[in-house]
A protein has these predicted regions:
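Active-site-adjacent beta->alpha loops and helix N-cap segments on the catalytic face
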Residues: 24, 48-61, 78-87, 104-127, ...
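Hydrophobic faces of well-ordered beta-strands that scaffold small-molecule active sites
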Residues: 11-18, 37-42, 69-73, 100-102, ...
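C-terminal alpha-helical cap/extension of soluble enzyme domains
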Residues: 187-249
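Conserved anion-binding
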Residues: 99-173
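Conserved N-terminal beta1-alpha1 strand-loop-helix module at the mouth
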Residues: 1-59
Length: 249
């Protein structure tokens, strides 16, 4: 059916969430969808619970598809809170991670410290992502759209390769989403128009959010927190191979 694929592969960034996938599951997933994403986040603090050989083997497998891997922000925040940042960087390097997420979703990091850690991550050779937003919806709602814009641009100036807009796994009542998971269009537009689009990644766990971001911004919009069994689904949305985007791109 290749002759029906008018758009073809989309050059973009897609981040997938690994919540506890076994090695064989990852093998099968990559066989089917390994060409459709390039960032893999081990969810929350799950990496602490795995045998380290499993982590090393999975990282090697992901890397064979040119997919960057990282632990997500929770372990970074724990390390920073416990003054164990050097140990953290050494450990992720030892286990084969090649990317880092700098965040303060559950803790507080002042702007100077944040910039310093972004710079440190870059100096150590890691692909560096940073995240804007709080895990607690009430605290997250205290950010104005302009503050989010300023934080994004500040992180990019500090050296962040990609800035993630917090959306959590639920995609509700957080960031650019209301309590029903609908996109707040004015916020979306303001952020998009005042930041480098190629360096902003929107967490969009729900299909309706993926559709709206693709149709509103473009099919190469950077998207994250994609469920591992919905990678191909997202790719069809990007290519206009599903009813939601068919004939609309």
């Amino acid at each position: 059916f290749k002759f029906l694929d008018e758009i073809g592969p989309v050059n973009t960034n897609t981040m997938v969430l690994d919540k506890a996938l076994g090695y064989k599951t990852v093998e099968d997933m990559l066989t089917i969808s390994g060409n459709y994403f390039n960032l893999l986040k081990y969810g929350w603090g799950t990496s602490i619970l795995y045998d380290e050989e499993i982590i090393k083997d999975k990282n090697e497998l992901y890397h064979s598809y040119n997919i960057r891997t990282y632990t997500g922000g929770t372990l970074f925040e724990l390390a920073n809170k416990q003054n164990k940042i050097d140990e953290y960087f050494n450990e992720i390097d030892r286990l084969g991670f090649n990317a880092v997420e700098i965040s303060d979703g559950s803790t507080t990091i002042d702007s100077d410290r944040r910039a310093q850690l972004i710079n440190k991550s870059k100096e150590l050779g890691f692909y560096t992502l940073s995240e804007i937003g709080k895990k607690n919806p009430q605290k997250d709602s205290e950010y104005t759209t302009q503050q989010r814009i300023d934080l994004i641009n500040t992180d990019i100036e500090a050296g962040s390769d990609m800035v993630i807009i917090e959306g959590r796994e639920s995609g509700k009542n957080i960031g650019i989403y209301d309590d029903k998971g609908n996109v707040k269009k004015d916020d979306l537009t303001s952020i998009y128009e005042n930041t480098p689009k190629e360096k902003v990644l929107w967490e969009a766990p729900q299909k309706n959010q993926q559709v709206e971001l693709i149709l509103t911004l473009s099919n190469d919009v950077n998207l994250g927190n994609i469920n591992s069994n919905e990678i191909v689904s997202l790719e069809t949305l990007r290519r206009g191979l599903r009813g939601d985007t068919l004939g609309k791109l």
